[in-house]
Amino acid sequence: MGPFFSLSGAGKWLGLVAAIWVQAICGNNYTFANYSDALKSLMSLTQLQLNNLSVAKDVGKAFGLVAGFASDCLPTSVLLIIGSVEGLIGYGAQWLVVSRRIHPLTYWQMCVFLCMGGNSTTWMNTAVLVTCMRNFPKNRGPVSGILKGYVGLSTAIFTDICTALFSSDPSTFLFILAVVPAIVCLTATFFLHEIPTPTKNPTELRQETLYFHVFNGIAIILAVYLLAFDITGNHGRVLSLAFAVGLLVLLATPLSVPLYSFISKPLSDSDIERPMKVSLLADQPKTTTTTGVELQYLERKRPSIGEDHTIVEMIRTFDFWVLFVSFLCGVGTGMCVMNNMGQMGIALGYLDVSIFISLTSIWGFFGRIASGLISEYYIW
């Protein structure tokens, strides 16, 4: 991404589009039910052993704390590369086993590779969320809602693409999980960077909010498109191919925002080549002295809600622990259901449970989008 494109203001929007694409392919933690039955039959596992494999996958996300610490000292591109390589190894090993290209690995080895696959998404999530929230400090709620919404949709995207083109084959599904995120993350390293954001006037803030409404609208259209494909039953080969093409077009549609921003606000030559002449002597800032009492007060002052916190400042707040306990108690039940969706469907007599996984993903997306918009309304 050239300096002209970055300075024009479209650079951070292109970075957001790259982040959306990363999120659209990194929801692989929620796809275990698509291939869990294949692992169970191939490795002759009991239901308890299969559940422990899903736990190993979820434990990988618990190590996401490492990605959070690393985000303060490593650039976005390095975080994305770590996540893509880890996912390629973790899901690649599972693909080799399910496709019978190698002999089944031992149980503990499979636990390690599932843990790696689960942890890979934390690096991708951290990279895009931290970078985009720093690029859009006044719209953190919409940014979070959009990016986490696409994570929810990613399960439906993977599931429906695999169903449309490969008839829900577990080995092909795992191959896609291993390769596609690696390709997208490596591509995103060229576009997703932290861009210094100058103070905006009210007009620019309104325009930024309008752009986020466009992103939300595109995401909702994509969700409805996936929902329509799921509820319309079986499709022929031609319709499935048409669906796949339409899905790729919808995923590319967010590019219209940075393109419009680039065309509508081009930089003039004077903005680039002629620096502003500023007197070095006139308008010198007045020096002020700070008393010891005032200095101690400034050092003790904590950032308010909505401002950047260090990790130490964060764990000292009551709000963090409320969120932590709520997340700890609430997410586990949902993950338990999603991990066992395949076994539940088979127990109820369904040979293909992909539609249930996809529908769960789509409705999860609507909840994520709503939470981002509502939280932004009350915080700002």
Question: Where on the chain are the PLM-derived regions?
Answer:
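Long, low-complexity inter-transmembrane loops of multi-pass membrane transporters
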Residues: 192-322
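Hydrophobic core of transmembrane alpha-helices in multi-pass small-molecule transporters
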Residues: 90, 102-124, 328
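Central cavity-lining transmembrane alpha-helices of secondary-active solute carriers
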Residues: 52-73, 86-92, 96, 156, ...
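C-terminal ends and interior cores of transmembrane alpha-helices
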Residues: 85-103, 189, 226
